[in-house]
Amino acid sequence: RYLALFFLVALVMYMVVAIVGAAETIMQGTKESGRLHHREDGQFGVFVPLTDGEIAQITEKGVTLQRDFSMDFHLGQSTLRVYQARENVDLFVSSQGSEVPAQGEILLEQHYAEKHELGLGDTLTVGGRDFTVTGIGSTPDYDAAYEKTSDTTVDSNLFGVGFVTAQNYEALKAGSAPRYA
């Protein structure tokens, strides 16, 4: 009887130590990934773009700003949020293919690509324009790709993120209203 109790206590202790060790590894990995890929320190949204004067007031305080507009496109039952490829903050990390899109190319969040069976070289139509998938990966701000901050679960069947060149973004914007972030 005491031997069984001893083994039960030892097993529970082993499980607790394993869970704590795994959690620490995940936290350190997330922190290191954020540092390597220039994860943002904060984010705010505005209803209209900031004026040059407002930007100057903010940057004088030592803050680096990056405009990060996006547009949501409905592709069947899912929504794809498209951003202009980033240069300084929240950089795209490729697990397959390119880290920087060229003209006519799109980079996709890896779970969205997987759920929609999209791979390198596939064509994806967004906003009436065809794009070739040339990169699949993630960004530190979309480790968990929530469509809204109030979402409680990630569903890559319903929401994903893509990145295109500045020219392609402007062409898409001509037919859509951007969200200011």
Positions of predicted regions on the chain:
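Alpha-helical transmembrane segments
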Residues: 2-6, 11-39
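Basic-flanked hydrophobic alpha-helices used for secretion and membrane insertion
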Residues: 24-181
